[in-house]
Amino acid sequence: MATKSTFKNFLGDLPLTAEIDWKLRTSRRPRKDHFNLDKLQKALPAARAVVEPIAKHAKPGKNVLFFATLHYWIEQSAFLGLALAGLGHKVTLLTLPYAEWHKEKDKFTQRQRVLHTRDALATLSPLVEHTSMLDLKPGAVLTERNLADIKEISLWDVQYTLMREEVDMNDPADRALYDLRIERNTFAAKAAFEYLQSKKPDVVLIPNGLILEMGIVFRVARYLNIDAVTYEFNDQREQIWLAQNSSIMKQDTDYIVEARCKLPVTDEMFERVADLENARRGARVWGKSKRLWQYVSSQGAQETRHMLGLDDRPVVMLAANVLGDSLTLGRDIFAASMTEWITKTVQYFAKRNDVQMVIRVHPGEKLVPQAKSMGTVVREALPELPSHIHVIGALDKINTYDLIEIADVGLAYTTTVGLETAMNGRPVISCGQTHYRGRGITLDPNSWDEYYATLEKVLSDIPAHQLNEKQTEFAWNYAYRFFFEYPRPFPWRLMNFWDDLEAWPLEKVLSAEGLAQFKDTFDFLVNEPFTWK
C-alpha cells in the first residue's frame, strides 16, 4: 500500500499526468472514491434550468463568497448557491475537495478530486462561479494573529477527530494528526488571505466556522474585516442555525436576548416549551426530528431516588457534555478543559458526604462510542467511588429529566440541561462559556477560587439560592427564544440532504410558497439584519 501511495505521489508531481489520465480514462469510469459528486453532477443541469429564468429578473444583490469543503458540504452548497443566485446575488463557490480532514491522500488522487469537482460543478456557470482552493498558489505572509488562530483551530481539529481533550504531542499518532492539520490550515489561511483580498466579497458564507478549514476561512475573513455568516443544523428538519460575524458553534445569543427576551411569554409559548420538555421526559421524538434525546421515559422522582439509593441529603447533579463535540470546543473559562473541571469537581465532592452527587453522562455518548466517556474521566479521578457519588452512564435506564426534578443544585459546562435545571428554579453553577451563562439565571464563577467559593456558599444554604419567580420566568422566556426563535426556517439540512431536496426542490423553494417560508433566512445568510415575524 505504501509503495502504491509513493508511486501515486510521484505521478502527482509530474505535470499533466492526472489531467491526461482523467480525460482519457478515469472520468468515464464509475467512481470508487469516497469523494463522489456524481449524483450532484447529474442533478445540477435541471437545477440550473429552474434558476436561470428566475435569476434574469432578480434585483442585483450582494457579492457572496461561499466556502465549502468535504463532498457533503459541497453538495448542499451547490444548491444553496443556486438559490442565492436566483435571488440576484453574485455567488462564487470556493471549494476544498478533500474526502477526509484527518487523512493524507496521495497527490495524484487529490489532483483528480479537483478535476472531478470542476466537472461536477461546471453546470453552475454562469449563475455560480466556481474556484478550487487547491488551484490557488498562495504566497501570503501570515501575521502572528493568523498563526495563533491556526494553532488554536488545529488543536481543536485534533480534539474533534479523536473525541478527547487530551492531545499528547509526544505520541506519534497525535503529533502526526496535529501536524497535518497545521499544514492544511496554514495553506487554507494563506489561500483565503489572498483570495478574499482579491475578490473583495460583501459577505463570506461558511458552514460551521469553528473547526477545520471552515474555521480558518472564517477567522481570515474577520481579520480582513469582511462580514462572515456561519451556519449549522440542529436535529429538526427544515431548520438552520445562523450566526453573523461569529461562529455558529459559539451559539452567541446576545442579539436575541436584546431583541426578544424583554417581551412577555404568552401561555401559548409556555405550553410549547412544556410540550418539548415533556417529549424529552417521555423519551419521544418531537416536532420534525427523528432524534431521541432520552432513551428511557420518565419513571418519576421517587422511583429514580429508589433506583439510585438516594437518601434525604441534598442532591447535586453534574450534567456532562460529549467530549470532542464542536459545541464544547473553545468554551473553557477557568478550567483548562471539561475533563479537568469534572476531575476536580468530583474530587471536591468526594470529601463532601453531607450531600449526594449524581453525574449524568450525556446520552449522546451512545452515538459516538469512540469518544472518551465522562464516566471514564470520573473513574480516573476517583478509582474508588464513594457511596454518595453516583455515575449514570449513557445507556443506563435513567431519564435526565427525573434527575432535574430531584436535583437541589445543578452543575453544567455547556449542556442545555443547565438551562432546563434553572427552568425548574434550581441554582445552577455555569462553568463553561455557554449561551445561557450571564443571563441572571445561573451562578457564573470566573476562576477556580470563585468556583470553590460558590460551591461552599450554595451548599451552605441551598434554599437561599433558589431562583425567584422573575428569574424562573426569564429562564422559560429564554428557553422559548432559544428553541423556537433562534433556529430559522430552511429547506435542506446537511444530513439527508437529498431527501430534503426531494421535498423542497428548487422550483418550490423559489416559488411564492417557498419564499414565504425561507426568503428571510436567505437574506440573513447574506448578512441582512435579523428580524422576527
State each model region's role.
Residues 54-57, 182-198, 309, 332-333, ...:
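Donor nucleotide-activated moiety binding/catalytic core segment of transferases
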Residues 202, 213, 239, 396-443:
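A donor-sugar binding/catalytic signature common to diverse glycosyltransferases
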Residues 282-380:
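Conserved catalytic-core segment of nucleotide-activated headgroup transferases in glycan assembly
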